């Protein structure tokens, strides 16, 4: 993860050229989350979910390079407490009483400000993908992109498409049967893109329905992480056996897990 600063003009973030080993990982915040936390009690904003309004670092909320709120507490049964930030006069920053109306992040303008650095990062990553492909292509039966429908795997797929020949890899979506509707929309959209540009796209599923596996194994947990093996990795392995026609195929997976993510995640 690269270090960054919040941009007061676009409402976005500006990446710095220095990578950092410690990342707060800013998260875009949409009005749906704001409504759930009670932002509409203190701030005025349009109820739309096409574009985020601000960023959150853990429990701290930033709007246009200004901290405007944080949350405290909260668990499965108790809502977190929203704590607005007030100025020296006691007014809520950008609050309703000031007449301010929160506006969404200017995505296109933010992208333009980050274009040069993103181009450097993209070119470097594409070269790494090509290097690994050339190193192993004669030793393997299949290269595949593990597609989840999330942002990381979407970026990964775009990079692999730019790096490798169309017929040199396949894309496999591991359908757990427990994805959000938005994920399935993204998968369908990506599948159509792949069909249009000639990239093989497959969907793998377990023969277990989610309701069956929950009854057999109980809910997934950090200690008993059966869900991935039952509903993702094993079905994908079976799908690659089907694609290659080999039970003992040798393959390489391109997976969208970033190097600076936590050890628990990786």
Region locations from a protein language model:
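ATP-dependent adenylation/nucleotidyltransferase module used to activate substrates
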Residues: 2-266
